Amino acid sequence: MAVQQRRVSKSRKGMRRSHDHLTISNTVACNECGKALLPHRACRDCKTYRSIKLSIK
């Protein structure tokens, strides 16, 4: 196994991890009930997708 040659400072560790943050996903409003949901997903409350009623069992 590899062993580190030098200790990694807090600053260097933070700089390496600077791109690891999570991004906030965009939300859109449902056309029927107006509830916020992820794009390209069916609404769980009114069971519609792009104003088309779905028959979910």
UniProtKB/Swiss-Prot annotation:
**What's a Gene Ontology MF term here?**
structural constituent of ribosome
For this entry, list what GO says about its biological process.
translation
Q: Which SUPFAM superfamilies match?
A: Zn-binding ribosomal proteins
Family annotation (InterPro entries)? Ribosomal_bL32, Ribosomal_bL32_bact, Ribosomal_zn-bd
Pfam families attached here? Ribosomal_L32p (PF01783)
One GO CC term, this protein: large ribosomal subunit
The domain of life is: Bacteria
Keywords tagged on the record: Ribonucleoprotein, Ribosomal protein
Instruction: Answer yes or no on keyword tRNA-binding.
Output: no
What does the similarity note say?
A: Belongs to the bacterial ribosomal protein bL32 family.
Q: What is the protein name for this chain?
A: Large ribosomal subunit protein bL32
Gene encoding the protein: rpmF
